[in-house]
């Protein structure tokens, strides 16, 4: 498979340029200031303090590697189902071209429940972070594979200045070193290689020795069964970002409950 990540990043840069022409920074700042914030990190910590897994449940229609995951896709219904069945937070795909996501999906999901929401997208510019705040996101994702360290630090500082939480995502040990220069307590280990889309949960287990005690590991991708959850919890990984396994189920929230509770 060709290098998907490079293609996505190129598209994102074009999208940012177009968005800046259509919605000037000052207009976006006005929208952002009108939005309330929910405590993303606090919601995860509360689950862990109660001895429960902290699940970031994903609202995702499709992916480049798997195609359409869910034909009947109603973000508000999915969000309510997740909230009812014990999710700590939501993750909503807003990328249109590769994941068939939408800003509207994030707005609808957030309005349907009280859970904090992560904007799941490929952030390459501070403008997208202000966009995230304006659409109602409570957290953003920074992907180490897509950013150099100085830019990642700059984007994190801007997100924090807006009150947004940051989940930094890594896939290998070099990226982990990069991520640990940030201030965020949330370190996502993506079991899927974004350059090949190959997936193994061993990726998380192999990097745990690098993570300081003051960081929370979120294992991402490839968590498909109760056995996968048990493997992670036995290794003291208690925060999860899961999408595909729930999206393929008749009722996403019930699938979450079966897998985690």
From Swiss-Prot:
Coiled coil: none annotated. SUPFAM superfamilies: Ribulose-phoshate binding barrel (SSF51366). Pathway: Amino-acid biosynthesis; L-tryptophan biosynthesis; L-tryptophan from chorismate: step 4/5. The keyword Amino-acid biosynthesis applies. Belongs to the TrpC family. It holds the Pfam family IGPS. Its EC number is 4.1.1.48. Keywords: Amino-acid biosynthesis, Aromatic amino acid biosynthesis, Decarboxylase, Lyase, Tryptophan biosynthesis. One of its GO terms (biological process) is L-tryptophan biosynthetic process. The keyword Lyase applies. It catalyses: 1-(2-carboxyphenylamino)-1-deoxy-D-ribulose 5-phosphate + H(+) = (1S,2R)-1-C-(indol-3-yl)glycerol 3-phosphate + CO2 + H2O. This is Indole-3-glycerol phosphate synthase. It is an enzyme of class 4 (lyase). GO terms for molecular function: indole-3-glycerol-phosphate synthase activity; phosphoribosylanthranilate isomerase activity.
